[in-house]
Curated annotation (Swiss-Prot):
Entry's Gene Ontology cellular component terms: host cell endoplasmic reticulum-Golgi intermediate compartment; host cell Golgi apparatus; ribonucleoprotein complex; viral nucleocapsid
One Gene Ontology MF term: RNA binding
Protein name, entry field: Nucleoprotein
Lineage: Viruses, Riboviria, Orthornavirae, Pisuviricota, Pisoniviricetes
Recorded name of the encoding gene: N
Chain intervals for the UniProt region annotation (Disordered): 1-54, 157-230, 265-290, 381-446
Native species: Equine coronavirus (isolate NC99)
Biased composition (Basic residues): 265-275
Length: 446
């Protein structure tokens, strides 16, 4: 008796002929039924594991379940023993055995002209079906991860028919309670396991266009089973509209908002503060010195907003490494905060001493070393306001360029201010004599 996922057990005997391509055919099933929906178009040959292009844009065979897509690089696809078989109505626990097959998807060209490879997607096939139908359970095959229920016999193939995409839709992948999903992966919720298949893509495009016409004509919304790519933006726009904010206008940071952000950061405990443009490093933790010796001029202004900070954050220890990998010491200190008339609180310091070890194999090692060398003890070379020592003031009357020190800095405005003597000309002497002559009365008659 063959089992069909999502349906009750079939009453037909399992004496059907299994073709070489892995599709189960009954004695009364003709080959013409497969071309029923071609509408005069030439039938496309079925892709197999051997004929799959190197780009990986064709999924060989059809899985009964939706795929699991990787979204973080470097994460291994694995399940614990006894886990990893999807739930399917009509499939007993004794037939819950098979493998996950890695489908390497195609690459695409980005806007800047570079090629970007999509992360792989995994599909489940029951034991004895799919691209590795003849492989024994547990065989070491690249891109294959074997899973089985504890009640299943892995020495015999699963008595499950292959999926016919023309009559059976893929089942959304679900697991029993307690199953731990691989980290860095998510389950596809579209309900299709062959997104690049021509038949399913045409059917989905026709269905989506018909659905859009129906929605436009009726004015009602039809719920969809998939998650659209712009759903996050739509939700954000609805939230902003509810709050009375326009999502299209850029948010401007005013002095009032910057002050509120700074005060919000300063209200946190010292070890929970994250300096940024609105609340600088000096405002959060004080001036640089021997005990706080990290940060160049640019990083002190931007804080964690500095473009170089994320790569440094990779070196930061976790909470577990901080407590279990450091030397800790608890000390009671004097409370210098608060007024004298307020009740004094007991203040303690949890002092720590540890080290962060890394080597040249760390990704971005050269950049990390460059940033560390630029910011460690940078306060000793700084001449701006972040330096511990004030900027030396120039002495009064002193100029740059090695000029005479007795020369005034400001140029005199007139010869009177210069207070310098000069020789009298003949005209000046004549005027002086006229001023010295006594006044004589003029008795001439008019």
């Amino acid at each position: 008796m063959s089992f069909t996922p999502g349906k009750q057990s079939s009453s037909r005997a399992s004496s059907g002929n299994r073709a070489g391509n892995g599709i189960l055919k009954w004695a009364d099933q003709s080959d013409q039924s497969s071309n029923f929906q071609t509408r005069g178009r030439r039938a496309q040959p079925k892709q197999t594991a051997t004929s799959q292009p190197a780009g990986g844009n064709v999924v060989p065979y059809y899985s009964w379940f939706s795929g699991i897509t990787q979204f973080q690089k470097g994460k291994e696809f694995q399940f614990a023993e006894g886990q990893g078989v999807p739930i399917a109505p009509g499939i007993p626990a004794t037939e819950a055995k098979g493998y996950w097959y890695r489908h390497n998807r195609r690459s695409f060209k980005t806007a800047d002209g570079n090629q970007r490879q999509l992360l792989p997607r995994w599909y489940f096939y029951y034991l004895g079906t799919g691209p590795h139908a003849k492989a024994q359970y547990g065989t070491n095959i690249d891109g294959v991860f074997w899973v089985a229920n504890k009640q299943a016999d892995v020495n015999t193939p699963a008595d499950v028919v292959d999926r016919d995409p023309s009559s059976d839709e893929a089942i959304p992948t679900r697991f029993p309670p307690g199953t731990v999903l691989p980290q860095g992966y998510y389950i596809e919720g579209s309900g299709r396991s062959v997104p690049n298949s021509r038949s399913t893509s045409r059917a989905s495009s026709r269905a989506s266009s018909a659905g859009s016409r129906n929605r436009s004509n009726s004015g009602t919304r039809t719920p969809t089973s998939g998650v659209t790519s712009d759903m996050a933006d739509q939700i954000a726009s609805l939230v902003l509209a509810k709050l009375g904010k326009d999502a299209t206008k850029p948010q401007q940071v005013t002095k009032q908002t910057a002050k509120e952000v700074r005060q919000k950061i300063l209200n946190k405990p010292r070890q929970k503060r994250s300096p940024n443009k609105q609340c600088t490093v000096q405002q959060c933790f004080g001036k640089r010195g021997p005990n706080q010796n990290f940060g160049g001029a640019e990083m002190l202004k931007l804080g964690t907003s500095d473009p170089q900070f994320p790569i440094l954050a990779e070196l930061a220890p976790t909470a577990g490494a901080f407590f279990f990998g450091s030397r800790l010491e608890l000390a009671k200190v004097q409370n210098l905060s608060g007024n004298f008339d307020e009740p004094q609180k007991d203040v303690y310091e949890l002092r720590y001493n540890g080290a962060i070890r890394f080597d040249s194999t760390l990704p971005g090692f050269e950049t990390i070393m460059k940033v560390l060398n630029e910011n460690l003890n940078a306060y000793q070379q700084q001449d701006d306001g972040t330096n511990m020592s004030p900027k030396p003031q120039r002495q009064r009357g002193q100029q740059k360029g090695g000029e005479n020190e007795d020369v005034s800095v400001a140029a005199p405005k007139s010869r009177v201010q210069q207070n310098k003597s000069r020789e009298l000309t003949a005209e000046d002497i004549s005027l002086v004599k006229q001023m010295d002559d006594p006044l004589t009365e003029d008795n001439s008659e008019m």
